[in-house]
Amino acid sequence: MAATTHLPFAYQLGPLEITGFGLGMLLAFVIGQIVATAVLERRGQDGEVMGDVTVGAVIGGLLGAKLYYAILTGDPGAILSRAGFVFWGGLIGGIVASVLVIRHNGRLFTEISDACAPALAAAYAVGRTGCWAVGDDYGRPWDGLLAVSFPQGAPPSTVANLVQQFGLRGYADLPPDTVLAVHPTQLYETAMGFVMFAILWRLKDHRHAAGWLFGVYCVLQGVERFLVEFLRAKDDRFVG
C-alpha cells in the first residue's frame, strides 16, 4: 500500500510567511490560556492572572527550548536558527518563567499549576499539529497503513537525512535521495495529548492536595514521551 505524501502548509501574507507551525503554536497558547482560566474560575478563583502567566510561559518556553537545543547540539549559534523548539527545554523554561510570574502576582504555584494541568495537555495536542503541518518530528521508517512520506519535511524524510541527521542504519543499499515512509508520530502525539486532556479534565474537580493534578499531568506526559520515543527518528532520544 502506497504511503500518504505530506506537503507542508504555509501562507504568504505580503512580506509575512504564516506557517502551520506558527499557527499551531499560537493556537496552543490561546487554547491553553482559555482552559486554565476556565478551570480557575470554576474553582471560584480569579482567572485574570492567566494572561500574565501565558505571556511569561511563551517567553520562557521559547528561550528554554532554544537554549536546550543549543546545549544538545553543542552549537551556541543554534539559538538563532529557525529550528530547535525542543519540548523539554520549552517545558522547563515555561515553568521557571511561570513560577516567577505567579510569585510576582502573589499567588501559589500549586494552585495555578493544577489549573494549568489540563491546559498544558490541550496545548500540547494542538501544538503538535504545527509539527505535522511543517513535516517536523516524524518517526522511524515504516510501511504500515498510516505511514506518511515527507518529501518536503523539515527535514525531508530521505535516506540521507535519516542516516546522517538521525543516525538510523540499514539503508545503505538505497539512493541517498530516496524518500522513505515513516511513522507520523506528530499525529500520535496529538491523539495522546487529547487523551491526556480528557483524563485531566475529568479529574479537575477532585479535591486533592494542591499540586496533585499537576503531578498527574507530569506522570502522563512522561509516559507519553517515553512511549513515542521508541518510534521517533530523532537521535536525541529521551531528551529532545
Regions found by a protein language model. Give the residues of each.
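A feature for loop-to-transmembrane-helix boundaries and adjacent hydrophobic helices
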Residues: 1-240
